[in-house]
Amino acid sequence: VSLSPGNREIEIKLRAPDPESASELLLTSGFSIQCERLHETNVLYDTADRKLREAGQMLRLRDAGRRSLLTFKGPGIPGRHKSREELELDLSSARTFEQILSRLGFEPTFRYEKYRTEFGRDDSPGAVTLDETPIGTFLELEGDPQWIDDTAAGLGFREEDYITSSYGRLYLEWCAEQKRLPGNMTWADAGA
């Protein structure tokens, strides 16, 4: 969801101890559930020579319940918040689009899954998602930088808690810590 001006995504992740305490923190801070817990499967695509990755770009196909979404993300801008161009397109059939991507020379390079619950607040210009992944629980705050900073502080987090890495990068770090060979960030592959 692109909540910032134009087609720019501005966000941070925050590590949470577990889904239950993270949900309780949000609910007691005035947030309410906007979209119930939903399983997402995400597949990143690139060319055989990894042109998108080299350019700092990403092409993702997401299946989330009855919704399929194609997302392009441009190179990130360094800073305390993750900021990058984001273009999204709702698809009627992820399977058909997978075939189109294949015919165009794109191949799947990384799969990851998570359970996502979306939270919001009536007076809030931003959104918070609670992501349960095979490598841990995260809160993702998306909106304008001031809203992100104010919301993170209101939830008891400090700027040094901000994570701007992608789930792919976090997964590679997790594999290194666990002394595991990287594969895909799925429940089956992570042994979660």
Q: Model segments located where?
A:
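Short amphipathic alpha-helical "recognition" segments used for binding
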Residues: 15, 144-146
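Beta-strand-connecting loop/turn residues
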Residues: 66, 135-137
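A short beta-strand motif that forms part of the nucleic acid-binding face
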Residues: 74, 134, 145
